[in-house]
Amino acid sequence: MYSEGKLLKVFLIFAGFIIFSLCGEVVSQRYPPAPGLLKYLEQDVCYSLYYYLNWTSLADCKTNFEETGISDVPSTVKVRCQSKNSIRFETEPSEHWQLFILMEHDNFDPIPFTLIEPNNVFGELITTANKEYQIWSTYLDEYGTLQDWMEGPIVLKFDQRNQQPDDIKYNVTQEFKYIILGNDSYTINGKFVWNTTGDRDLCFDIANICQNTNMKHAKIWPTAHPSFDVENLVLNDECEIHVKGIHGTTKHKYKTPSCFELPECFLNNMEPEIPQDVAIAADQDLRGWWNINVAWAKPHFQPEIYNVTVRANMIRSIILPGNATETTFRNIPNTFLSAGKIYNVSVYAIIGQKASHTSRRAFTPGMLRWVWAGATAGAGCAAGGLLAATLLCCGHRRATSRVSQEDPDEKTPKEDDVEIIGIESGSADDHWEVRSDRVLLHEVIGEGAFGVVRRGTLAPGGKSVAVKMLKEFPSQEEVRSFRSEMELMKSVGAHPHVVSLVGCCSGRKPLIVAEYCSRGDLLSYLRSSWDIIVSKHTAKYYNNNMDSMDTSKLKVHKEHTKLVVNKLYELQGPCETELTPLDLLSFCRQIAMGMEFLASNRIVHRDLAARNVLVTEDKTLKIADFGLSRDIYEENQYKQKGNGKMPVKWMALESLTRRVYTTQSDVWSFGVVIWEIVTVGGSPYPEVPAARLVRSLRSGYRMPKPVNCSKPLYDIMRACWNASPRDRPTFPELHQKLDDLLHSACANEYITLEVDVDEAPSTPKPQRYIKMLIRGKLPWSRESYERPVNPTSNLYSSPPVIQTKTA
């Protein structure tokens, strides 16, 4: 009996130990993160909140992480959509911040998390397809205090075969609404609707890509009636919307209505068509005087009149009826236009008070070679006939545009050289002129050796502009160059991705009034975004929902903020949201579109770089300073030759060795700009001194592929850096290649915003994206990523230098 009782006692003790151990194991598994991971999680979450909390709250936030327990109240979160890369969930709204994490069983990988701001109900968490997770959540107050963790649902492994039926496309339909903005401005708003295929098919990623407007993208949260609104579409634009859901991506092409398809727009707007296919040619008669022929295509809708203007050392205009398609300026004296000089021709189509125009530039043919033949009296008749035939042949040579490797010696017309024929005061030819009293000047936003740029307001509409002017006591050469720049900007015309002329004052104190881009230059914009990426991802986590927060509702303590602001521009905007891979790819495409326009106008930029591209409030990129030299440069970026500075790290090999500048040399520079964008503001050739660059390029060296860049995108860069200019792609081809990349399913396949330097795969795969993004080490070292403490200059402060043109 005693032995049986003792045996029973031992059994009970052993059973109790087993039960205690099992219970302890269950409790330990219910606690969300392991202690080591909890430390990393608290760092990343608290630093993410640091942008909206003060310094004391940051310390409290870390302490609260250590003291948080487990709540008996279950979480209200529900998984609504699941794909191979993420889940999207819905929760109850709260007046507090909510923190959601994904715990993987028996694994010590970093923990994906997301923060949802007060009163929001949807969120997204990054997953890996072949893993099983559990969601945990908690609340945080405005001081960073955490409540107890609440246990949420299990997220099962994603089975793509069961989730994604084959060959299913969404039926996308659209309707457009015509909007009158005032001031003779019009736009289109589009609404796109598509079907769903069941309860698991309720979440979508949308990208809208148009030829003439910015790409727009959005996440569609769970809804049984999905739709997407696109505002501010351009009339007569070709677009494509991508709807990515559980069944893959459906691409729907559409074209926005033209003004002529909308009765209200047609009646109220009636913009004359821009003259197309403008061709110009000059020939010289036997007296040495010039005739310039101008021809253009017949428009679909005839304007009231045409105003055709030629500018050389004089201005001459002709008014023509609306059915005209050709005219000739005859008997221009060689005192106004000489051989081998540049001239500009503008064709304005005019209806009422509205005008559209196209401008072209060309060189007159070289000096005539007069051949005088001496002959004897007996052979005089034959020699005279031969001489006459030679002169007639030479006298009617046509002009052809040709490449200029040096700046042409162009002169602007003097006031007493102006000759105007058949033009009335206030007509289309002087519509650029703005009275100086209409421009209200504000603070200086840029300053160079020769000029100053101020932010301005243009009356009466109150439009923000950038006003460029010369400094006090300019030289005659500076005034001449400034006026040449003014005429050049008139002739370039308007494009969505080129900084356009708003107006000018051509009086004694000339002014250039241009578009104002509030976010400054692209290089500073990229680097400010990089600062945000580094600060938000210092440890081992990625908060993929922060970019959707309304930061205007949050309290920011400026005395503790980490934000670095370039005071030359309003850079608070870039510091509020980080860029996405889709943004970076769109930036490359926008620059290609702007350069395609300049190349079509036979304009060579010669200084294409991220610092020479401006960013507007809505992330539209505009190429600036095309064809101009800059005053101030970053150290080791420009090499002095005579009185000119050269952007050696952006220049093509032939430009460095032979000073040849063509559109194809701009293509080389564009490849460097792509590299700047992919590296989010990195300095090119970080390991190569400028003095050794030419030797390195000649030997075949090219910048290696950035670790966060895919092979297809890097192949585009390498194609731009081909040693043979003829073998480089053209800008239309680059535009098409970037369109093809954007049309693919996921921009993350081509660019990631952070990389794992421990493993550094040459081509990051999509399933590795989150792991690379949440690792704690930075992808670029201080030595290879040069960042100036202060901006070296801005895009408006370049000295005006004459434009270079190609054939």
UniProtKB/Swiss-Prot annotation:
Pull one GO CC term from this UniProt entry. Answer: receptor complex
PROSITE patterns (alphabetical): PROTEIN_KINASE_ATP, PROTEIN_KINASE_DOM, PROTEIN_KINASE_TYR
Q: Which residues lie on this side of the membrane: Extracellular?
A: 29-370
Ordered alphabetically, the record's keywords are:
ATP-binding, Cell membrane, Developmental protein, Disulfide bond, Glycoprotein, Kinase, Magnesium, Membrane, Metal-binding, Nucleotide-binding, Phosphoprotein, Signal, Transferase, Transmembrane, Transmembrane helix, Tyrosine-protein kinase
What topology in the membrane does the UniProt record assign? Single-pass type I membrane protein
Q: Which residue positions carry a glycan here? A: 54, 171, 183, 195, 307, 323, 344
- Enumerate the active-site residues: 607 (proton acceptor)
Which cofactors does this gene product need?
Mg(2+)
Tell me where it resides: Cell membrane
| Binding site residues for ATP | 445-453, 468
Q: Name one GO biological process term.
A: cell surface receptor protein tyrosine kinase signaling pathway
Q: Which reaction does it catalyse?
A: L-tyrosyl-[protein] + ATP = O-phospho-L-tyrosyl-[protein] + ADP + H(+)
Which loops or segments lie on the Cytoplasmic side of the membrane, by the record? 392-807
Q: What does this protein do?
A: Probable receptor tyrosine kinase. During postembryonic development, involved in the initiation of metamorphosis probably by inducing the production of ecdysone in response to prothoracicotropic hormone (PTTH). Binding to PTTH stimulates activation of canonical MAPK signaling leading to ERK phosphorylation.
Q: What is known of its domains?
A: Contains 3 very unusual FN3 domains in the extracellular domain. The second FN3 domain is involved in the binding to PTTH dimer.
Name this polypeptide is given: Tyrosine-protein kinase receptor torso
Q: What species is given as this protein's source?
A: Bombyx mori (Silk moth)
Q: Which gene encodes it?
A: tor
